[in-house]
Amino acid sequence: MQKTITPLSPTEQELEIILSAEEFGPEYNKELDEAKRTVHIKGFRKGHAPMGLLKKLAGPSIEIAVAEKLGGKYFTDIITAENIKPANRAQIADFAFTDDTLTLKLVYEIHPEFELQDFSGYTFTKANYVVGDKEVEREIELILKSHGTMVTSDEPASEKDTVIGDALRFNDEGELDEASKVANHHFSMEYLPAENPFRIALLGKKAGDVVEVVNTPIKEDEEGEEATAEDAEAVKPTRFQVTVTEVKRLELPELDDELVKEISQERFDNVADFKADVRLQLEQHFTMKSDNDLLEAISGKMVEENPVPVPNSMVESFQDMLLENAKRQLSGNFPKGFDVTGFRASMRDNAEKHARWMLITQKVAEMNKLTVTDEDIVAFAEKEAGKNEALDIKQIIETYKSPDFHDYIADSIMKEKVYNAITEKVTVTEEETPVPEHRM
């Protein structure tokens, strides 16, 4: 066998393999015998057609089959021996048979060779979220909202109330358009933006009050930016009249031991333990958020500083992944008429960053000689089991070591090792940060 590896780009190579008759002959004869046994040629019984006629009719398909089988076999042997890291399956670009030789040309993408920029001088700020009593009470209030009751209020609408009213639009002549009436529309004061004209007009109003609302749409330019007065077309404000019919207020239940049992499905039987768990869950959530935000900052910096060429097949793979993630968020399907092709194309830059970051993390693992052992998997399983006493540690270990889960768990462990290897070299300054508010 003769081989020649030719670089086509930093991420693509061509491999030429020349096999002698002794090397390709057995496979060729095997395919020829199979064709002789199975191919039916009119005028001849199966297996009795002249060899010359059989080669003439079935020869091209035999040659393709032989080229594909031997191409795959020798490609695997060669990349292993040459320590080549392919990024995709090799494609046969060309092949040629003679009586004495089979010449194969394979094209494939590779993980590029590159030197990682020194990152020991990088500095990052990590948020240190402090969960206090205020944050715990705020979270409990959110939980209680799902168990609250909407009751009618005779008081003026507050920032947490819902105003129910009949809305009518004024026409161009300044008269109310009865055809535009929307009865019993619910305006949630809590979730409308502070600058929303309906929120501004309805705050402090009671049942029976009538308000006029002027809504002026914001004109945007073709790029989605807010247009200036000079280049924007005149946008007519729309006037509405809203007659308040009712103000609803969410009445929260009292948090007691019985409600705790219901909310927690008997996990807790008293308020103190429930509050302690809420605090723990918040701390774990914001610790994870802090870690993820730091990782995002690190990856962004390292991707920016290391413009590594990325194999196209890797980028396309990440495009597919991002597309599927978006689809799952929409219950598995995009809306009818959605431009999937255009949407996929718009994600290419993001996909390229994901692919580049993957190459960088592989380089960090290689530089630090990081590996994942069975002991690592056991330790990972023990840590996960510690989060839930109901879990059986032996069963978790068996599951994590099973073929269905092993690669995924090993990848998770490797990511953590790479993260630790990076954070040990960079400077990370913790900064006390208020816990952000969130709404249901």
Curated annotation (Swiss-Prot):
Domain writeup: Consists of 3 domains; the N-terminus binds the ribosome, the middle domain has PPIase activity, while the C-terminus has intrinsic chaperone activity on its own.
Stored HAMAP family: Trigger_factor_Tig
Class of the enzyme per the UniProt entry, highest EC level: isomerase
Annotated Pfam families: Trigger_C, Trigger_N
Its biological purpose: Involved in protein export. Acts as a chaperone by maintaining the newly synthesized protein in an open conformation. Functions as a peptidyl-prolyl cis-trans isomerase.
Protein name (Swiss-Prot/TrEMBL): Trigger factor
Localization per record: Cytoplasm
